[in-house]
Amino acid sequence: MYSSFSKKFRQIKPYDNYNVTDVPWHEAMVAGNGRLGVLESCAPIEDSLIYQNVEFVMPSEEPRHVPYDVTAQLDEARQSVINFDDTWNIHDRKRTNMYCYHPGHMIRLTLEGEPDISGYRRWTDYKTGTINTKFKSDGASVSKSTYVSRKQNVIITKIISEKSVNMSISIDDFESMPKFGVQKNNIPAPERNMLYSRFVRGNIIGTVVHYPEYEGSELAKGGFAGVTRILTDGDMRVSSKPKDSRAYTCIDETAPVINISHAESITLITYTDWTDDLGEYCEFRDRVNGKDTFALVDKCINKVNSVNITEEPVSLDHKNIELKLDGGYFCESANEELLDLQKNEYDIMPHLLEKLYYNGLYGMQACAGTTAPRLSGLWVGEWNLLWRSAYTMDANVNIQVSGMNSSGLYEAGTGYMWFILRQIPDWVNNAAMVYGMKDAVLVPVNTDGHRAMMVEYDINYPFQYWNAGAGWMLIPIYEFLQTYGDAVITTDDVALIKMYGKDTFDVRKDVYEPLLKKTYNFWKQIGNPEYYTDTDGNARYENGKCSLNESEHYLIIPSFSPENKPFGYHSAITANAAMDISAAKDVINMYTEMLNYTKVDGYEQAVSEAEALLRMLPDFMYDESGAVKEWSMKEYGENNAHRHISHLYPAWPALQTQHDSKLAAACRQAVINRNRENKGKDDTASHGWIHKALVEARLKNADAVYDTLNLLVHSDIFYTTLFTDHNTDRSKGVYCTDTAFGLVGIINEMLVYSDEHTIELLPAWSDKLGSGMVKGLRTRCGITIDELKWDVDKKKVYVSLDWGKTEGINVVCRNYEIEKIGHER
């Protein structure tokens, strides 16, 4: 029932030239445990398994420190903004980048003898996270299953054949994978300078790779390894084939192959890992040729040798979530058949929407536990994926975790917190370097998972002045506490344990409160009374001014509203971005709430200071259409021809529109203006559509949410696995999980809105989607929706709630009559 089913497959051919809109590995099925993952083509004769480790990044010669001149540029930036000088260009700065996520080794399983294949099907079991393939080879049944064990932290593939088969197992050249050695604009990529060797030790085939050596890189002596242990009831022998001349970073003369014959059972156990201490780059070749051992390889071999192969896949966390729509059912149609059917249907097909929902839940769970999802989730089947498959924090990570807490994905929440904790030291340094702040945080647009220093900025994308990031990253942690209450989490991550000196963290005391204090400190320090708006709302600069007068407000200067700039203005470095205003208000309110909760010594005075700061912040402004302005500056014109909607932060992720009807109406109008004025190529980036739908759901605009989802399901964004591209027209050929995971957040928001005092049922559910039922949603007031049923014809709703210890919650439904509220305690 809960599965992704396809009758098609795409064989991944080595050294293949493919069309950017039709990439074979994009059609692979996926599995993961948050740290390790796998892409499997499921091709019957030549299957490919591409292994993943979420921490794999390719070092480069890009600097790993904040530019030293950024501190001195702050006054220049402020003066350029206050004087409306859009020619200041950060001294022609060239943006540098984080390290790029890369795939691990790829195993190729080849059935010998060119058998006749029939009865083919493949599917992913969402309940157990298992990729399954079944077919007949010369009339004999063959089944394959692959899953990633959370308990043992390995990838296990089992092949069972009704009759004995012959199979060869080999590791593909890294160079044979798409885009090896080539970055955007055909710039040579750093992996051209890596070195690798393949080997066989008994029944283990593997590879060890030394990263290229760059001065200042923490991975100058690093590398990665991957090994696959093979168990079979057949015969096994080792052969070799000449190395392909195109495998120029491979130091071997031949490539090993394991040949299996007369086998009815074959099991593969794979583990892959990295290190920053593989030894000197210049010694790697001699060590391999001298049969020297590498501690990393030994670690990997010991891991696969210790595995209990009798372990069965276990049910995943999302098993408690259930969505059923009338007219929606898991019919026998394959994914590609449903997508084709949808193209010929005007309205959204409920059974497709159900499948997309479960697919998103599955993908989120597969990425959960170690970190947050990358741009491509956990998976990559090529080198130099566009945007380096980074963790992008100006919408993409945020969108992908939007349904995390409401879906009750506890492991996803803990992984998100590990993701945040790894970055905080760099965030503190960013705030110190860019603004000269103490004990504050400034979030970059991207992290590669290892570092989060402020390097990715230039005049077109001045992210050094993106001020709202920490507030945005804080919200899911705040929601985690609202959802689950106080909790203690434990990690086995050596780097985290070394960084913080412990392995156990109280979510409130060790994660949320320290980060909130640092985020508040940022807003406390950014205000400079020399830069302000006067009583008439005009932007002013007064050298030496030490305090604000009554009715004056701080300018948030400089400011950046990702990734837009005012109409007719040539610089994105501005002041008073609505996103900044909203984030600042949100953080200050969270901070005062925390103070009133903890009641530490002197908290009353601290609350008074925070409330005073809140009054000194700029207010939102509104344009002639009534829309909230992207910049609260009289001097800037609106620019609605843009995919990003950063100025709608008050609606989502914040909750500020829920009790402010004027602001809510202004945000609704802002969406209308964007829809009207931003059409064409810029409107194909899926994150813009998903972001918009999340905002529309919070604004309780059911028809608008439905229309956005309808556009999505009629686009070309979905692969046959139901995972997604970055663009609705696949024009960039980028595997991206924004839409796949973001859909879960959207549907949850359509079904239930909640805050600490309120549960609203079906706030943005369109009647066009019909009646249905959902179980297991979590709320921000700590209550679980055991079951919610609704009937769009009768306009009645039934809900059963698990109240727990929570009291004084108001349950409302604007468009339906609540027929019954069931209570469980």
Which positions does each model-derived feature cover?
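Beta-rich accessory regions
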Residues: Y2, D138-S141, V148-N153, S161-I204, ...
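The feature captures the catalytic groove of carbohydrate-active enzymes
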Residues: D276-L278, L375-A390, D439-K509, K524-E609
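Catalytic cores of secreted or luminal carbohydrate-active enzymes
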Residues: D86-D116, R121, K127, V734-D786
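Acidic/polar, glycine-enriched structural segments that form the non-catalytic walls/loops
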Residues: M1-Y391, Y410-T414, I420-N430, E635, ...
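Glycine- and aromatic-rich loop/turn segments at beta-sheet edges
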Residues: T371-L385, A431-V434, N528-F560, E624-S632, ...
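Active-site core of glycosidic bond-cleaving carbohydrate-active enzymes
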Residues: E46, H65, M393-N396, N405-N429, ...
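Active-site-adjacent bridging/hinge elements
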Residues: Y2-R10, G327-E337, G369-W379, M437-V455, ...
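Extended, hydrophobic/aromatic-rich amphipathic alpha-helical segments that build helical scaffolds
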Residues: L353-C367, A470-E479, P514-W523
